[in-house]
Amino acid sequence: MGVTKELKSPGNGVDFPKKGDFVTIHYTGRLTDGSKFDSSVDRNEPFQTQIGTGRVIKGWDEGVPQMSLGEKAVLTITPDYGYGARGFPPVIPGNSTLIFEVELLGINNKRA
């Protein structure tokens, strides 16, 4: 249970986000049946958040710090690290495993 990371394209291998850092990412979220529920890429607007502080789902708080600046990866997140039994109606059913394609574009003021 938790989050697993599949590397798609390596980052710089040097800069990794730490708890409390602000990150800029592009992502596409899908359910295991392949249906897309959200995408910053489709909106052409990267997502910014503080990581490791509970502002996003636990799977992101745990998975994004495993990525280095510029990296592209797929994060597979079990329900207990996602939206749990309640889900996120109407787009994410309860107990859903989430699959996110993520690109780490920035950490604080440093860009890939």
UniProtKB/Swiss-Prot annotation:
Picking any one GO molecular function of the record gives: peptidyl-prolyl cis-trans isomerase activity
> Cellular location of this protein?
Cytoplasm
**Lineage: superkingdom:** Eukaryota
Task: Kindly give the InterPro entries that the UniProt entry links to this protein.
Answer: FKBP-type_PPIase, PPIase_dom_sf, PPIase_FKBP_dom
List UniProt keywords, sorted A-Z.
Cytoplasm, Isomerase, Rotamase
Q: What does the similarity note say?
A: Belongs to the FKBP-type PPIase family. FKBP1 subfamily.
* Protein name, entry field: FK506-binding protein 1A
Q: Name its species.
A: Aspergillus fumigatus (strain ATCC MYA-4609 / CBS 101355 / FGSC A1100 / Af293) (Neosartorya fumigata)
Q: What is the lineage of its organism?
A: Eukaryota, Fungi, Dikarya, Ascomycota, Pezizomycotina
